[in-house]
Amino acid sequence: MGQSKSKEEKGISGTSRAEILPDTTYLGPLNCKSCWQKFDSFSKCHDHYLCRHCLNLLLTSSDRCPLCKYPL
């Protein structure tokens, strides 16, 4: 007991591990920026997308988008 040799550590040399990134494919143009639901019909506002339902709601209140302040 106590006379066993410890195992040699095998170092990983020269290989880098893959960086783990969260799955963000559900963000971006696939979702409405106002309600964040996935829909089929989108309208492009200045730098984001709005679904048809949110676009109609926003147009009843103002000519400008409350998210980016550009004209709808």
From Swiss-Prot:
<keyword id="KW-0519">Myristate</keyword>
<keyword id="KW-0946">Virion</keyword>
<feature type="lipid moiety-binding region" description="N-myristoyl glycine; by host">
    <location>
        <position position="2"/>
    </location>
</feature>
<dbReference type="GO" id="GO:0003723">
    <property type="term" value="F:RNA binding"/>
</dbReference>
<protein>
    <recommendedName>
        <fullName>RING finger protein Z</fullName>
    </recommendedName>
</protein>
<dbReference type="GO" id="GO:0016020">
    <property type="term" value="C:membrane"/>
</dbReference>
<keyword id="KW-0449">Lipoprotein</keyword>
<keyword id="KW-0479">Metal-binding</keyword>
<dbReference type="InterPro" id="IPR038485">
    <property type="entry name" value="Z_RING-type_Znf_sf"/>
</dbReference>
<dbReference type="InterPro" id="IPR003224">
    <property type="entry name" value="Z_RING_Znf"/>
</dbReference>
<keyword id="KW-1032">Host cell membrane</keyword>
<keyword id="KW-1043">Host membrane</keyword>
<dbReference type="GO" id="GO:0044220">
    <property type="term" value="C:host cell perinuclear region of cytoplasm"/>
</dbReference>
<comment type="subunit">
    <text>Interacts with protein NP; this interaction probably directs the encapsidated genome to budding sites. Interacts (via RING-type zinc finger) with polymerase L; this interaction inhibits viral transcription and replication, Z partially blocks the product exit tunnel for the releasing nascent RNA product. Interacts with the glycoprotein complex; this interaction plays a role in virion budding.</text>
</comment>
<comment type="similarity">
    <text>Belongs to the arenaviridae Z protein family.</text>
</comment>
<keyword id="KW-1035">Host cytoplasm</keyword>
<keyword id="KW-0863">Zinc-finger</keyword>
<keyword id="KW-0862">Zinc</keyword>
<dbReference type="GO" id="GO:0008270">
    <property type="term" value="F:zinc ion binding"/>
</dbReference>
<dbReference type="GO" id="GO:0020002">
    <property type="term" value="C:host cell plasma membrane"/>
</dbReference>
<keyword id="KW-0945">Host-virus interaction</keyword>
<comment type="function">
    <text>Plays a crucial role in virion assembly and budding. Expressed late in the virus life cycle, it acts as an inhibitor of viral transcription and RNA synthesis by interacting with the viral polymerase L. Presumably recruits the NP encapsidated genome to cellular membranes at budding sites via direct interaction with NP. Plays critical roles in the final steps of viral release by interacting with host TSG101, a member of the vacuolar protein-sorting pathway and using other cellular host proteins involved in vesicle formation pathway.</text>
</comment>
<dbReference type="GO" id="GO:0044423">
    <property type="term" value="C:virion component"/>
</dbReference>
<dbReference type="Pfam" id="PF03854">
    <property type="entry name" value="zf-P11"/>
</dbReference>
<keyword id="KW-0472">Membrane</keyword>
<feature type="zinc finger region" description="RING-type; atypical">
    <location>
        <begin position="32"/>
        <end position="68"/>
    </location>
</feature>
